[in-house]
Curated annotation (Swiss-Prot):
Molecular-function GO term, any one: tRNA binding
Annotated EC: 2.8.1.13
NCBIfam families per record: PRK00143.1 (NF001138), trmU (TIGR00420)
Protein name, as recorded: tRNA-specific 2-thiouridylase MnmA
Keyword Lyase: no
Reaction catalysis annotation: S-sulfanyl-L-cysteinyl-[protein] + uridine(34) in tRNA + AH2 + ATP = 2-thiouridine(34) in tRNA + L-cysteinyl-[protein] + A + AMP + diphosphate + H(+)
The protein's role, per its UniProt record: Catalyzes the 2-thiolation of uridine at the wobble position (U34) of tRNA(Lys), tRNA(Glu) and tRNA(Gln), leading to the formation of s(2)U34, the first step of tRNA-mnm(5)s(2)U34 synthesis. Sulfur is provided by IscS, via a sulfur-relay system. Binds ATP and its substrate tRNAs.
CDD domains, per the entry: MnmA_TRMU-like
Primary localization class, coarse: cytoplasm
GO cellular component terms, semicolon-separated: cytoplasm
Enzyme class: transferase
Spans annotated as Interaction with tRNA: 149-151, 311-312
Organism: Enterobacter sp. (strain 638)
UniProt-annotated location(s): Cytoplasm
Length: 369
């Protein structure tokens, strides 16, 4: 007598990637069910409509594939474990990445636990563009096959024990192939555009949205030479390397080169700007990272040659990583890097393998400044 098929719960977002993931798993012989997560309760009309449309699309796909769709509300977990931390980081003048926190706390913790305990799942699956490889009894996290869509940067906090319970069917495909499959199946999500914006909160006017939760604190904009060139509405609205939205042009005698944010003086509420995107004040020779997560969950000591990304879609930067203590590492780049931003994540790679990463605590500026 053959064993009954393994049960997989697919996180259905109402998008094309999770839709095709569900179908691929059916083809592979799994018993597939879907789960739609509602994680945001602060409903304004616009967001409510978006969530309702996503749920309707997820339901339509599940109906088409003949699978059951469960719904669950993780809004309390999202607020407590993701959103409040997100606001705290902005308040402290740093630029957090909510998608990384959301994957850690919601998709691969709350969802994983709910699927296993309440729905009796053997695995969960998501539409992330990553792959897993099982080596020597541990699961590794690999970049997605489609380099342009690879999302391993957002999943570096996962441990091998979470990866072993997770399946990533579209990680083995290129995005155009995924859309083609959806079109061939006549799925409602086939031509739906990819979502952007904050994880689960969606696409909003960011300044307006943040202003609802954090009071604006206007302050001076000064140049690296100390000249007063304008006023900002709050350091939280600005990030290192930012060019747009500063509201300052070229100076009278000076160059017409665009201005970039090169520093945030949180103590004095001052935004520091300079002209040119490779201004020395914007360049770093390295960084200190904390809150480390290694995929293999082994403590890191000594030094390591690898590559690092300090933001999503960045070209890999060759570097040397040195353990400072259990919680912190120093990263030295082979060449200076622009706009290394505290609060963002530094994610380490060895070839295709995502080793893990940490939060950028501080950047190490170019010594010549």
């Amino acid at each position: 007598m053959s064993a009954s098929p393994k049960k997989v719960i697919v996180g259905m977002s109402g998008g094309v990637d999770s839709s095709v993931s569900a179908w691929l798993l059916q083809q592979q012989g799994y018993q597939v069910e879907g789960l739609f997560m509602k994680n945001w309760e602060e409903d304004d009309g616009e967001e409510y409509c978006t969530a309702a449309a996503d749920l309707a699309d997820a339901q339509a796909v599940c109906d088409k594939l003949g699978i059951e769709l469960h719904t669950v509300n993780f809004a309390a977990e999202y607020w407590d474990n993701v959103f409040e931390l997100f606001l705290e980081e902005y308040k402290a003048g740093r630029t957090p990445n909510p998608d990384i926190l959301c994957n850690k706390e919601i998709k691969f913790k709350a969802f994983l636990e709910f699927a296993a305990e309440d729905l009796g799942a053997d695995f969960i699956a998501t539409g992330h563009y990553v792959r897993r490889a099982d080596v020597d009894g541990k699961s590794q996290l690999l970049r997605g096959l489609d380099g342009n869509k690879d999302q391993s940067y957002f999943l570096y906090t996962l441990g091998h024990d979470q990866i072993v319970q997770s399946l990533f069917p579209v990680g083995e495909l290129e995005k155009p192939e995924v859309r083609k499959i959806a079109e061939n199946l006549d799925l409602i999500t086939a031509k739906k555009k990819d979502s952007t914006g904050i994880c689960f909160i969606g696409e909003r006017k960011f300044r307006e949205f943040l202003g609802r939760y954090l009071p604006a604190q206007p302050g001076k904009i000064i140049t690296v030479d100390g000249d007063d060139v304008g006023e900002h509405q709050g350091l939280m609205y600005h990030t290192l390397g930012q060019r747009k939205g500063l509201g300052i042009g070229g100076t009278k005698e000076g160059s017409e080169e665009p201005w970039y944010v090169v520093d945030k003086d949180v103590e004095n509420n001052i935004l520091v700007v300079a002209q040119g995107h490779e201004h020395p004040r914007l360049m770093s020779v390295g960084l200190i990272a904390q809150q480390l997560h290694w995929v293999d969950r082994e403590p890191f000591t000594g030094t390591l040659r690898c590559t690092v990304k300090t933001r999503y879609r960045q070209t890999d930067i060759p570097c040397t990583v040195t353990a400072l203590d259990e919680e912190r590492v120093e990263v030295r780049f082979d060449e200076p890097v622009s706009a290394v931003t505290p609060g963002q994540s530094a994610v380490f790679y060895s070839g295709e393998i995502c080793l893990g990463g940490g939060i950028i605590e501080q950047r190490l500026p170019l010594a010549a400044v």
